[in-house]
Amino acid sequence: MIDKSAVIHPSSIIEEGAVIGANVRIGPFCVIGSHVEIGEGTDIKSHVVINGHTRIGRDNQIYQFASIGEVNQDLKYRGEPTQVIIGDRNLIRESVTIHRGTTQGGNITKIGNDNLLMINTHVAHDCIIGDRCIIANNGTLGGHVTLGDYVIIGGMSAVHQFCQIGSHVMVGGCSGVAQDVPPFVIAQGNHATPYGLNIEGLKRRGFAKEDLHAIRNAYKILYRNGKTLEEAREEIAQLAADNNNQYVKIFSDFLENSAKSNRGIIR
């Protein structure tokens, strides 16, 4: 179904069954598959291929040569009808690739709202990206990677499969992230290690002084007091319970969740 207000260049191919919302613009030489849904106001430039079971929200901008919903690169994939789900107001720049999920990873690759994926970003199968994240040019997320909200991944950086990146993390350019990165932390290098807290980013987002102080205390327990990871995890959990700070609770919950994975935490 194509809304009558949509503007589609005659050279583009829209397969039967695709759903094209109101005021969508599709430029020249695009291919939109039969199981694709594109939300109202989304602007697709030119030479874009969107296929598979892909649902895209409203007011997104998708630039030339992007490929969304393509068969993933997991050798176990056997053509199951897995999905890509993209939210609203995302900016997806030239040559970005976003692959569909796998049955082993929950069937979905999911991107939230208001994200910027710069040129040549790769989002592999089963990745989950929150809101207001930025992945700079040539950034790569391996399969099953999770990004919280407000994450920044520097240019030419790669995140190993199954890693979790907490909210408000900044990963420096040309880094290789092979372990989980707790919220609010700056990570840099190959392999990436902690370089303090993303204080400037938190200030720009309006974090109060008392919240920054509480986050610093949690960071010091994890990284500067010579404790084992298990000791630090327990002490931060107690700190979260004692001071009732929402951000320390986020920090503590991340550490608890990370304990269930096999990647470990950057140290």
UniProtKB/Swiss-Prot annotation:
It catalyses: a (3R)-hydroxyacyl-[ACP] + UDP-N-acetyl-alpha-D-glucosamine = a UDP-3-O-[(3R)-3-hydroxyacyl]-N-acetyl-alpha-D-glucosamine + holo-[ACP]. GO terms for biological process: lipid A biosynthetic process. Its EC number is 2.3.1.129. The keyword Nuclease does not apply. Signal peptide: none annotated. Pathway: Glycolipid biosynthesis; lipid IV(A) biosynthesis; lipid IV(A) from (3R)-3-hydroxytetradecanoyl-[acyl-carrier-protein] and UDP-N-acetyl-alpha-D-glucosamine: step 1/6. It is found in: Cytoplasm. Pfam families: Acetyltransf_11, Hexapep. One of its GO terms (molecular function) is acyl-[acyl-carrier-protein]-UDP-N-acetylglucosamine O-acyltransferase activity. SUPFAM superfamilies: Trimeric LpxA-like enzymes. Gene3D superfamilies: Hexapeptide repeat proteins, Udp N-acetylglucosamine O-acyltransferase, C-terminal domain. One of its GO terms (cellular component) is cytoplasm. Keywords: Acyltransferase, Cytoplasm, Lipid A biosynthesis, Lipid biosynthesis, Lipid metabolism, Repeat, Transferase. The keyword Transferase applies. Belongs to the transferase hexapeptide repeat family. LpxA subfamily. Homotrimer. Involved in the biosynthesis of lipid A, a phosphorylated glycolipid that anchors the lipopolysaccharide to the outer membrane of the cell. This is Acyl-[acyl-carrier-protein]--UDP-N-acetylglucosamine O-acyltransferase. It comes from Proteus mirabilis (strain HI4320). The gene is lpxA.
